[in-house]
Amino acid sequence: MIETERLILRPWLKDDILPFSAINSDEEVMEYLPKCLSLEETVQFYNRIVAEHDRFGYGLYAVETKSDGLFIGYVGFHHFDFDAGFSPGVEIGWRLAKEYWNQGYATEAAKACLDYARINHLFNEIYSFTTVGNHRSERVMQKIGMSRVCFFTHP
């Protein structure tokens, strides 16, 4: 578990599935992703997240607010191995419910994840990527100290 001033980043609970599905089915949240996810697809995603965390001891963390204990999305690490010049690797990523956008939550949680990775010597390199035009994600990347290395076509 990782704590920040306002957030708790923790392992996933089955109770997270329905609010996670609501996030994944929101067209505005999913605007820069291939498609919205159904409940069944969200359950499959949840299972992959839990399996990756079980395998490595870290992964995409469920994010909840300290003030009210509500699940608001995820932030954390994901192993990728798609065909790219920098693959395989570890990505830091985030997805929050839109009512929690523009409040610094993604930046706060992502910084805490990077600090955790540094302190525990988890990775030599961490990547983050987004779709051209997703300025919100680009701003988070900049705020956590990442810099653009390249453009690529995601398979």
Residue ranges and their predicted role:
Residues 1-31, 62-155:
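Acyl-donor (CoA/ACP) binding surface of acyl/acetyltransferases
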Residues 28-49, 59:
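Conserved GNAT-fold acetyl-CoA-binding loop/helix
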Residues 51-55:
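PAS/LOV-family and closely related PAS-like sensory domains
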